[in-house]
């Protein structure tokens, strides 16, 4: 199972000056640990009446599996920290994985934000391959509303790349807002003929106002010939 990781600022500054920005981004994904961990396992006591789960699919790769959940906000206000619970079953219908273990990073149990009347894809790339996972279902829990407009964050130039023989996607995140984005998650979904064939995510520890930061996401699945979709839901609201 490949861990998705983020580099702390001090480690980023310590990288050799001869490294390219892209190499630093790759090192960011490979060597650091996302520190926002859930102290307790995820429990959804009440399903959201504002968020619809439009679909949930499982993607298989050589080093594990990943779940992609498509969500829609049916309300007139933006939402933050949307809890998402997934249940993965094998072909016989037995549950083999749920994302409710204590210690999971927040990004593996929730979506940072969801715009009013907007849609988003959330990715859990830490689904173990043990137990022969075959299907996944998801529910979204109640989440707090955001007052005002969400800080604007955009992803540009998403394209296939390769790191140490592994399929990856690279691109740039730009923070167009005045709010520093902390622990910003970039989700990448690869579709071929409308079907999800690969997915992954990257975590950027910090994106300052007006800054552009490269990312690299390791992908689970087979992205060859697929169209990449990348997004970075707002994580910090000022």
Language-model-detected regions and their locations in the chain:
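Membrane engagement elements in two modes
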Residues: 7-170, 174-182, 191-238
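Bacterial N-terminal signal peptides that target proteins for export
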Residues: 1-6
